[in-house]
Amino acid sequence: MKKNLTELVFILDRSGSMQGLEGDTIGGFNAMIEKQKKEPGEAFVSTVLFDDQTEVLHDRVKVSDVQPMTEKEYYVRGCTALLDAIGGAIHHIGNIHKYARNEDVPEHTLFVITTDGMENASRRYSARRVKEMIRRQKEKYGWEFLFLGANIDAVETAGHLGIAPDRAVNYHCDSEGTRLNYEVMGQAVSAVRCSAPLDEHWKDAIEEDFRKRQKSGRQ
């Protein structure tokens, strides 16, 4: 494996229910990437946008070469084909690693999945198949998967996909919640890139915000 090289895969919801949060999503993502450019080590970035279709915005682009996302790429529409986005990305990255020389395979692989609603439009992949794919990559190759969900039970949904409770978190799908998501996401990515242990506390800030606003009734 290639030391100090990380495979980063971002799977981002852009279905119709994300309307009104385009600017926050674009700004949060771009700020996170800019911070990653300053981190030590190398990284490849893949970004998959999904609604009822899947669009690959970045396909293993060196983090230093990633251009800012704009409203031309991130615009909301359609339904939520979450399983197709996850399954397609795992298949693609898995094949690249499978046929690469061992010394070229990244030391770390991290998938970050964000969605603000229930799966309702996938045609190619089932939950059972995606769960098996995730299990295999985690057990055999040590891949990490983080799941950030709004308007659903994120822990339960992630569990159906084989993602552990300590790797899933509920968030408020608004401007404040979206900004916090990308801030925390960036911290988790930095930890993985420098081989620091990613414990259950990676999501504390998001959980605190979610509980506080849920308790006060402020959405």
Protein language model features and the residues they cover:
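Acidic, low-complexity intrinsically disordered regions
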Residues: 1-219
